[in-house]
Amino acid sequence: MSHVRTPQPKTRPEWLKSMRAALIATVAVCVVLLAFAWPTATSRVENLPVAVVGSQEQIDTVTQKMPEHLLELHPVANREDAVNGIRSREVYGGIVLGEQPEILTASAASPVASQMLTGVGTNMQRGIDQQVIAGMQQALQKMASGGGAAPGGPGAPGQNGGAASDGAASGGAAQAQRGAGAQQAPGAPGATPPTVKVTDVVPLSDDDPRGSGLAIAGLPLTMGGMIGGVLISLLVTGVRKHLLAIALYGVLGGLALAGILQGVFGILQANYWANAAATGLGIAATASVIVGLNSLIGRPGIAVGAVLTMFIGNPISALTQPKEFILPPFGEIGQWLVPGLSGTVLRDLSYFPEANIAGQIWALIGWLTLGVILTVLGHHKNESALRTAEG
């Protein structure tokens, strides 16, 4: 009798499985870190849109003393126009030159931009003070040199010496006026340099004085939309039930999240119902896209939707810094993904009622509609595949 040995299937060593799991986890955490860190690491403080009031000569003088490309200046006729531009979200702040220099900020638009403009005001004040001191020193030097002449001569203190003093004072005044519009000659008795006033046109609320709450609110809203999409995809079947679940989630989730953000923490301001509607639209749009991708391509669609929302849309949403600071063109792209759209709408509803948010609302509706279309297409695709298999 012969004995035939059955070959045993080869099994990989256990340590290889452990190594593979560790490598996959390492790659995953590195991708997550890169996704969230690179917008900040590559950000550049430049091209901040700011309104400016003053003559071209004054604007040129101030511009020459600033780092190149720091600000994108938009000349306006007067202070009122600058304030209107801030309240409509056309600019982040304003610089008023002339006899009463002033820096206009909006901490509600961006605490980072507000701090930067405050620094610009500090530098302007330093420049004005230096010009005044230089003018006074020049006047004193000319007075001292004129005081050494013989009495009654050409350099007598009451004649040419006084003229020299007046000329020096006029020169100092001209310098101060070019920088910020001083009213008095720096060398004149009792002359004081103009003070650069800083005004927060649209301040943050007392409940969120540093804007940190509004900045981090985008993450739970993004995760909320993603979690809703995943749960609906896994727990609900059928196109009608999918769409009904998305609609109900948008309504209930919007009311609940807005209630927490506004009623509990005071992060959101103004009308609660408007904030709830915007919040619900945002999370419904995210959930809709994830459900649609899952219906169309299966379980990988959930991963695609999560990556698009969490690891692409959220880091470039510009909730923590102006979009102009994010590496182009990603700052602008982020404003048309759901996290950026939701953040902009909620910020404007809370603090900038004069801002036009129609474009952002329609864009969110567009994302919601895209998810619905993908859901319907996926349903018909699955039905066709089932009929083919049965036939």
Show which residues each predicted segment covers.
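Generic detector of multi-pass transmembrane helix bundles and their immediately adjacent loops
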Residues: 292-391
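Short beta-strand-to-loop elements that line the ligand-binding cleft
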Residues: 71-78
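Hydrophobic alpha-helical transmembrane segments of multi-pass membrane transport/permease proteins
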Residues: 7-45, 219-227, 310-314
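Terminal targeting segments of Actinobacterial cell-envelope proteins
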Residues: 1-16, 192-206, 331-334, 343-344, ...
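Alpha-helical transmembrane signal-anchor/signal-peptide segments
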Residues: 41-57
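Transport-system extracytoplasmic interface segments
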Residues: 57-70, 84-231
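Transmembrane alpha-helical segments that form the functional core of multipass membrane systems
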Residues: 210-318
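Hydrophobic core of alpha-helical transmembrane segments in multi-pass integral membrane proteins
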Residues: 30, 253-258, 368-377
